[in-house]
């Protein structure tokens, strides 16, 4: 039993306060009788904690090197607000609100954490991600979805300051060269045609279909075939496989781990404990499944050698320098990264693009005219016929979809190198984290007119009939969906190739409309900080139900 007692102590006459002094005690029942424990120790600890907080407050608010940059006072004291924003999937909305709130006092810089600055000046892309050596490295706190395995890292974590990153990028670059992608075209077209054949079945049945699911099935099968030499089987199975279902959890788990490291530090006991407590077991299990399956399939594909299937591994194994530069474990880690990033991110763009086009009738009409006017048959929709100069309006709509829903949903932090760096004219001391938030930078009116509206015309030449003068001051360089510099997305060309082929094929074959327009618009609205879109490094997408009507053509 616990009970409280208080003892009034007398005050020496003529000295001190006239108020009685009390000492709080607690009586605890033990088997061998009552013992009285004093709270003196607890009060001292509380006082010490209060003193520590006061010292922290004074240091981080009054003497910290980043003190002049505005932001919420709690963010300047603790990593917790930024960690919660990331773990909840709402970092993109939170950072946009912060930049909007502090725009008048800071211009384009906000202190989002004690040791981190966020920039929405388009010039920050160059200053942070594409600067001359010494480059800004990733910090262990901000490791993404794929971390170190058995002492080895993939291209995403290989340090720029060593030869490791260039070694990885050079080895993988052969597989992503334009010449290699042209040779891989049949693999891509096979999955695109498979998608179209399934969509035709739904169109004939006049049934609504969730394009969020079907685009995801397509990109998973496509990346499985390109990376591992075999599709996941989502399209033919008309649903997700166990493996493909695991991939989104790689990003969710990665976001949670990053949030935990923000608060607990790197490789600490607190990090280990919080991971076990906070990360759902299901998420951790799915992540382990993805790594196990990837390892097994990669090693099998390496053993198969240069079989007559021109996937990414074919070109990596074919090039002796590339094969010698990477160990089997490094190849496996890179394949995990490629299939994860290449499937979910492209599916997000496809789905967002379809929503925007279905809700903008004038855009839809011009796209139909361009695509159906350029191709007499579906077989003509190939690499050489879908280049930007041939389908300029399709290209503009893709750029606009990537601006509104960029593939990386969260900031990609970098650490200022020794000696400090100048970012957007500001001298930033070494050791601090800096980043451009990809959503905030494109959703603010300081960079784009009507920033949450879908306006492909902003990407068109000024002599185009749809050009509007209100977009004359748009800072198009603020949109960098594939980042810049030595860590820019290796699969950028592949992503554009997939987007052009899939989207052109869908609009050439079908008339498409939203099935549940009001509900779907609520889910996909860009207003209210995209309140139904969650970003865990990449996007967790809401449903997109549509109705398809197959276009009938004379034989």
Swiss-Prot record:
Q: Indicate which residues are glycosylated according to the record.
A: 325, 360
Q: Where in the cell is it found?
A: Membrane
User: Which cofactor(s) does the record list?
Assistant: heme
One GO term in the molecular function aspect is: oxidoreductase activity, acting on paired donors, with incorporation or reduction of molecular oxygen
Ordered alphabetically, the record's keywords are: Glycoprotein, Heme, Iron, Membrane, Metal-binding, Monooxygenase, Oxidoreductase, Transmembrane, Transmembrane helix, Virulence
Q: GO CC annotations?
A: membrane
Q: Which PROSITE patterns match?
A: CYTOCHROME_P450 (PS00086)
How does it sit in the bilayer? Multi-pass membrane protein
Transmembrane feature ranges:
38-58, 141-161
Q: What is its EC number?
A: 1.-.-.-
Looking up InterPro entries in the UniProt record yields:
Cyt_P450, Cyt_P450_CS, Cyt_P450_E_grp-I, Cyt_P450_sf, Cytochrome_P450_monoxygenase
Top EC class, one word: oxidoreductase
What does this protein's UniProt record list under function?
Cytochrome P450 monooxygenase; part of the gene cluster that mediates the biosynthesis of abscisic acid (ABA), a phytohormone that acts antagonistically toward salicylic acid (SA), jasmonic acid (JA) and ethylene (ETH) signaling, to impede plant defense responses. The first step of the pathway catalyzes the reaction from farnesyl diphosphate to alpha-ionylideneethane performed by the alpha-ionylideneethane synthase abl3 via a three-step reaction mechanism involving 2 neutral intermediates, beta-farnesene and allofarnesene.
Q: Which family does it belong to?
A: Belongs to the cytochrome P450 family.
This chain's protein is named Cytochrome P450 monooxygenase abl2
Q: Which organism is it from?
A: Leptosphaeria maculans (strain JN3 / isolate v23.1.3 / race Av1-4-5-6-7-8)
Encoding gene per record: abl2
């Amino acid at each position: 039993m616990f009970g409280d007692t208080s003892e009034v102590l007398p005050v020496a006459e003529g000295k001190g306060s006239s108020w009685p002094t009390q000492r709080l005690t607690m009586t605890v029942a033990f088997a061998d009788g009552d013992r009285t424990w004093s709270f003196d120790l607890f009060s001292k600890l509380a006082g010490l904690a209060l003193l520590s907080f006061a010292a922290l407050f004074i240091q981080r608010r009054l003497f910290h090197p980043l003190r002049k940059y505005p932001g919420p006072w709690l963010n300047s004291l603790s990593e917790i607000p930024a960690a919660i924003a990331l773990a909840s999937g709402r970092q993109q909305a939170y950072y946009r609100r912060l930049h909007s709130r502090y725009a008048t006092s800071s211009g384009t810089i906000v202190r989002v954490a004690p040791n981190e600055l966020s920039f929405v000046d388009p010039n920050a892309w160059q200053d942070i991600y594409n600067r001359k050596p010494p480059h800004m490295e990733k910090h262990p706190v901000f490791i993404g979805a794929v971390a170190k395995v058995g002492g080895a890292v993939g291209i995403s974590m290989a340090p720029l300051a060593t030869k490791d990153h260039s070694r990885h990028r050079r080895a993988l670059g052969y597989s992503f060269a334009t010449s290699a992608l042209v040779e891989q075209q049949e693999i891509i077209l096979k999955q695109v045609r498979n998608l179209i054949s399934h969509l035709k079945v739904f169109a004939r049945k006049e049934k609504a279909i969730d394009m969020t699911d079907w685009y995801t099935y397509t990109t998973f099968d496509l990346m499985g075939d390109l990376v591992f030499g075999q599709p996941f089987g989502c399209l033919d199975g008309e649903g997700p496989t166990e493996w493909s279902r695991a991939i989104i959890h790689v990003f969710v788990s990665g976001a949670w781990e990053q949030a935990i490291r923000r608060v607990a530090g790197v490789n600490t006991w607190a990090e280990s404990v919080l991971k076990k407590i906070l990360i759902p077991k299901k998420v951790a299990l799915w992540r382990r499944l993805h790594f196990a399956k990837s390892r097994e399939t990669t090693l099998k594909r390496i053993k198969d050698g240069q079989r007559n299937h021109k996937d990414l591994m074919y070109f990596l194994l074919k090039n002796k320098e590339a094969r010698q530069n990477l160990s089997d474990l490094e190849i496996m880690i890179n394949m995990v990264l490629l299939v994860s990033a290449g499937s979910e991110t492209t599916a997000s763009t496809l789905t967002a693009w379809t929503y925007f086009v279905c809700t903008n009738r004038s855009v839809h009409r011009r796209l139909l005219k361009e695509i159906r006017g350029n191709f007499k048959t579906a077989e003509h929709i190939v690499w050489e016929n879908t280049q930007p100069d041939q389908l300029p309006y399709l290209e503009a709509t893709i750029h606009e979809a990537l601006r509104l829903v960029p593939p990386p949903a969260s900031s990609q932090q970098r650490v200022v190198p020794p000696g400090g760096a100048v970012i957007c004219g500001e001298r930033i001391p070494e050791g601090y984290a800096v980043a451009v938030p990809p959503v905030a930078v494109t959703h603010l009116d300081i960079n784009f007119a009507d920033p949450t509206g879908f306006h492909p015309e902003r990407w068109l030449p000024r002599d185009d009939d749809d050009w509007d003068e209100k977009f004359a001051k748009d800072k198009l360089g603020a949109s960098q969906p594939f980042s810049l510099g030595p860590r820019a997305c290796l699969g950028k060309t592949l992503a554009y190739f997939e987007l052009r082929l899939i989207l052109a094929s869908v609009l050439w074959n079908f008339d498409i409309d939203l099935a549940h327009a009001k509900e779907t618009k609520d889910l996909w609205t860009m207003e209210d900080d995209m309140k139904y879109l969650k970003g865990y490094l990449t996007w967790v997408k809401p449903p997109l139900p549509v109705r398809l009507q197959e276009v009938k053509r004379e034989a």
